[in-house]
Amino acid sequence: MSLTEEIKKRRTFAIISHPDAGKTTITEQLLYFGGEIREAGTVKGKKSGTFAKSDWMDIEKQRGISVTSSVMQFDYAGKRVNILDTPGHEDFSEDTYRTLMAVDAAVMVVDSAKGIEAQTKKLFEVVKHRNIPVFTFINKLDRDGREPLELLEELEEVLGIASYPMNWPIGMGRAFEGLYDLHNKRLELYKGDERFASIEDGDQLFANNPFYEQVKEDIELLQEAGNDFSEQAILDGDLTPVFFGSALTNFGVQTFLDTFLEFAPEPHGHKTTEGNVVDPLAKDFSGFVFKIQANMDPKHRDRIAFVRIVSGEFERGMGVNLTRTGKGAKLSNVTQFMAESRENVTNAVAGDIIGVYDTGTYQVGDTLTVGKNKFEFEPLPTFTPEIFMKVSPKNVMKQKSFHKGIEQLVQEGAIQLYKNYQTGEYMLGAVGQLQFEVFKHRMEGEYNAEVVMTPMGKKTVRWISEDDLDQRMSSSRNILAKDRFDQPVFLFENDFALRWFADKYPDVTLEEKM
């Protein structure tokens, strides 16, 4: 098969949702259909011994939450599918946002009882900004939920995207009977031995069933007043195809997967800082690091840089340019994933996600190129911390483990490190409290380094230039520090302290992001 044909087989997408909408469960079912697991791990309770395949970190298994993006790959129906299962918890939005830079489409999972929730809206806005296609799966039809028409209306009003139902539920909760499949023009049956039936048999199958009569009325209304189906509008991110189903009972998921792969886009190009778009079908290899993960194999204390291949083909042992440093690197120890499981690969193509063994060479956002190509892809999003804590080792004899743990976990990008300019104390910044809990858990579990964490009462951070640096600017309301790149910053206790500082030192430029 030619390189072009291989690239065109790739379908790379992320699954996004509010916590507990069923995102990880649907991921499990997709892996089941892809033949990667024998049964979906539908149990996520910490008292059970069965856990979601994509939740590989100990804290995820203990607390039943996803706190890091997982990468999974399988072959299905002639396509190579790359799934990125993202954390739904808002504290980990930075990891999720970066992951969304590495995909060509998104699957948005919505709880039928709750509709569009806060985190779903946040993540959708990122996807919308990139104009990538969004496929919607309205989940939990095996439970009572809101009316389908109401859910479609909310999609359009809250998210501002047109919708087109690919199927329609017949009943809900205990009265759930199946799906009226508008795209494939058939009925998908929830009960009984037969999985499908023709639409012509519907009146006989559901004789005197008020829910089926309501379905026919709803569909007639949609055909008269609903949006027209347009494959181009889907690819442009202007129309979301909507699928109903139940991930927990694995109903409607395979139909969704089949139809998704029919309309999901091939790998797309990425913009460089100069405004050019790198064609995925170009011969020369290029890619970017969108995530760094330490201790995927705790026995070896390793670190993996996740790279989205943008163009060309990776071959084992190839040399690349690391544009940020201007130095070369050799890609020899490279893997692909099934959550924490991995296997060595000798080649991969545009659209694929590979893991490069990292000894400290790479940073999130790095661009990799070959030959004379020295461009950089557009920078990944960064976030300003809102909570700060002092951190120190509980046992001074564990200094070495403490420093190694901090170095590796900070490089993942979910938490930021600062060092007090005057005292040398370490301080951490995060978007949410859960990030500190995960940090503490991982320091103790993965590095055997217990830590003491103390709230600081600081709420925001601003960067300044070296030229403006003056230690006399420090006061009780702000702390002068350096970030992990040795750039000077001020940590302020509140917005009032920030405004007071800006008024007192009008010539000092305060940057919200480095």
From Swiss-Prot:
Is the keyword Oxidoreductase assigned to this protein? no
Q: What is this protein called?
A: Peptide chain release factor 3
Gene symbol here is prfC
Where is it located?
Cytoplasm
Listed under GO cellular component are: cytosol
The residues that the entry says bind GTP are 17-24, 85-89, 139-142
Identify the main location. Answer: cytoplasm
Q: Which GO terms describe its molecular function?
A: GTP binding; GTPase activity; translation release factor activity, codon nonspecific; translation release factor activity, codon specific
**Is the keyword GTP-binding in the record?**
yes
**Homology family:** Belongs to the TRAFAC class translation factor GTPase superfamily. Classic translation factor GTPase family. PrfC subfamily.
**What Gene3D superfamilies does UniProt report for this protein, alphabetically?**
P-loop containing nucleotide triphosphate hydrolases, Peptide chain release factor 3, domain III, Translation factors
Cite the InterPro entries for this sequence. EF-G-like_DII, EFG_III/V, G_TR_CS, P-loop_NTPase, PrfC, RF3_C, RF3_dom_3_sf, RF3_GTP-bd
Please explain the role this protein plays, according to its UniProt record. Answer: Increases the formation of ribosomal termination complexes and stimulates activities of RF-1 and RF-2. It binds guanine nucleotides and has strong preference for UGA stop codons. It may interact directly with the ribosome. The stimulation of RF-1 and RF-2 is significantly reduced by GTP and GDP, but not by GMP.
